[in-house]
Regions:
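C-terminal substrate/ligand-recognition segments
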Residues: 372-445, 450, 476-505
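N-terminal, post-signal-peptide metal-ligating segments of extracellular/periplasmic oxidoreductases
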Residues: 1-128, 134-136, 219-261, 266, ...
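Histidine- and aromatic-rich segments of cupredoxin/plastocyanin-like copper-binding domains
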Residues: 106-126, 197, 208-368
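Ser/Thr/Pro-rich low-complexity tandem-repeat tracts
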Residues: 552-554, 560-562
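Extracellular/periplasmic metallocenter environments
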Residues: 75-81, 89-178, 296-354, 430-434, ...
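Active/binding-pocket-proximal capping segment
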Residues: 278-292, 429-470, 496, 506-509, ...
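Peripheral, solvent-exposed domain-edge segments
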Residues: 189-190, 194-196, 200-201, 207, ...
């Protein structure tokens, strides 16, 4: 349905405040609720799921090396808001319809605090999944300051829970970054971009089977395919409406000065290629998922964002007084070779530049931003070859896999040792770009190249392809493009245990494009001993106390929180 653009102001999710402390650690309680929320001037209120009853959820603002405790509480209804496919692994008929678990995306945390897909829980913790450990999560924040986010990660229904509204920002800060004097306060704004579709009554539309289109789709709707489950998962979801921070095509009034925007692609499957409608306005890139770059990159005219990717940018509106400027999108769907965006989907939000400043702009964007260690491929102890493939399930539906294996097939095939550096090669034999996300670690992208032949039998590798500016820093999600091998390098640690790695197209993730890796104990590595060349704000030594204490702290908090 067509809604008028730029009639609603951009909302700002509120910053969470701790409930108090437990053993001196700030303690938060966040409750998932079903509420009605107004998403556009001309739409009736929409039923959404929100953390603390807000879509998107409230923002955590935390400090490096200052841990917090969070009790995630499920007070959602017993029946799901969206169509649940009971043939999908993890969502079988014997499982409760509504299950939740929260993943702190890019959090350097132990496995029991990671939000494992099978650590789900139901309302009031009445039922829990096989990997559930405790009610209170311990986040040590022993990592670089960065733009993290939190979202649902429940096996088999992640796509539905996130679509319903379960996502929010988690901003990690420190004094060194604040001393840079980047734009801050009301001039630092997180933006989460998502696509959705609506029924005329304001409710979310999500397809019940492949081929079902949102209103105003042709009437009558297509017949139910009797050869498929009903409801059935779809290969990917692409909405016909863009929301930013939970508002449909919003506007933001800005002053003629520098702003800092932390931009997250929070969509299920849609990619964005963002730029500005004014050709002389561009981005200064200062950070990616894993925090600030070593040096700023100026004059960036466009940025590609896959689902889960983030960028940290400065935009200077000083020379655009009185102008209305559109943040635009040129990405095809599916990416990269699908349909170009419609006129509606080529617009994201509007910036209305005022004539005057409220106060002088004293913020700066220094040339040098942070210490950034470059991992040396020569230090890698293993090069792992991973192949992305297309398959079909028992109903003939498209099913993408990692190494032709499903989520729970044993043995676990990726088994790095704690503290070691590995190179992972991602060979994509499918026609789509897949955003591949590894839990626990951040990594760097070494190279991309085309390949031909069998990836498992001496493929022919072409020359390296240029990386985008937004791929030069620490990452937690890499775009594995079709017909290419993407090479990433990571130091695994500091926690040991089992973590997921997966495609962050949520329909793919829910339909088996997810595997586990196990970070194994390494008797030759002590995370409390500094590694030469590692930047202080990224050192594993920040976490060494937490490695011993986090589980016991969380268990103690579970006991006290149930008093």
């Amino acid at each position: 349905m067509s809604l008028e653009k730029f009639v609603d102001a951009l909302p700002f999710p509120p910053v969470l405040k701790a409930e108090g402390t437990r053993d001196g650690i700030p303690y938060y309680e966040v409750t998932m609720k079903q509420v009605m929320q107004k998403l556009h001037r001309d739409l009736p209120p929409t039923t959404v799921w929100g953390y603390n009853g807000l879509y998107p959820g409230p923002t955590f603002e935390v400090r490096r090396n200052e841990p917090i405790l969070v009790k995630w509480k499920n007070e959602l209804p017993f029946e799901h808001l969206l169509p649940v496919d009971r043939t999908i692994h993890g969502a079988e008929p014997d499982k409760p319809s509504v299950r939740t678990v929260v993943h702190l995306h890019e959090g350097r945390v132990s496995p029991e605090n990671d939000g494992h897909p099978e650590a789900w829980f139901t309302r009031d913790f009445e039922n829990v999944g096989p990997k559930f450990v405790h009610e209170v999560y311990f986040y040590p924040n022993c990592q670089r300051p960065a733009t993290l986010w939190y979202h649902d990660h429940t096996l088999g229904i992640t796509r539905l829970n996130v679509y319903a509204g379960l996502a929010g920002f988690y901003l990690l800060r420190d004094e060194e970054e604040e001393e840079l004097n980047l734009p801050s306060g009301k001039f630092e704004i997180p933006l989460v971009i998502q696509d959705r579709s609506f029924y005329p009554n304001g409710e979310w539309f999500y397809p019940t089977q492949p081929g079902h289109e949102p209103p105003p789709a042709p009437q009558p709707p297509p017949a139910i395919d009797p050869t498929l489950p009903n409801p059935s998962i779809v290969p990917e979801f692409f909405g016909n409406t863009i929301l930013v921070n939970g508002k449909v095509w919003p506007f933001l009034e800005v002053e003629p000065r520098k702003y800092r925007f932390r931009i997250l692609n929070g969509s299920n499957a849609r990619f964005y290629r963002i730029s500005f409608s004014s050709p002389d306005l561009d981005f200064t890139l200062i950070g990616t998922e894993g925090g600030l770059l070593e040096k700023k990159i100026e004059n960036v005219s466009q940025i590609i964002l896959a689902p889960a990717e983030r960028v940290d940018v400065i935009v200077d509106f000083s020379n655009h007084k009185g102008q209305n400027i559109i943040l635009t999108n040129e990405a095809n769907a599916p990416f990269p070779d699908g349909n170009p965006p419609s006129p509606d989907l080529s617009q994201i939000m509007q910036f209305r530049v005022k004539q005057k400043l409220s106060k002088p702009d004293k913020s700066k964007v220094p040339e040098n931003l942070s210490c950034l260690e470059r991992l040396d491929p020569g230090d890698a102890v293993t090069v792992r070859k991973n192949v992305l493939v297309e398959s079909t399930d028992e109903f003939g539906r498209l099913k993408n896999l990692l190494n032709n294996l499903e989520w729970d097939q044993l043995p676990i095939t990726e088994t790095p040792y704690n503290g070691t550096i590995e190179i992972w090669e991602l060979y994509n034999t499918t026609p789509d770009t897949h955003p591949i996300h590894l839990h626990l670690v951040t990594f760097q992208i070494l190279s991309r190249a085309t390949f031909s032949g069998d990836p498992n039998n001496n493929p022919v590798i072409g020359p390296p392809l240029p990386l985008d500016p937004s791929e030069t820093g620490w990452k937690d999600t890499v775009r594995a493009n079709p017909g290419e091998v993407s090479r990433i390098i990571a130091r695994f640690g500091p926690f040991t245990g089992i973590y997921p790695w997966h495609c962050h197209i949520l329909e793919h993730e829910d339909h088996e494009m997810m595997r586990s890796f196990e970070n194994l104990d390494n008797q030759n590595f002590n995370p409390c001993i500094p590694i030469p060349g590692v930047c202080p704000d990224d050192s594993f030594t920040q976490c060494c106390q937490d490695i011993d204490d986090d589980e016991s702290s969380s268990d103690e908090q579970d006991e006290s929180s149930s008093d």
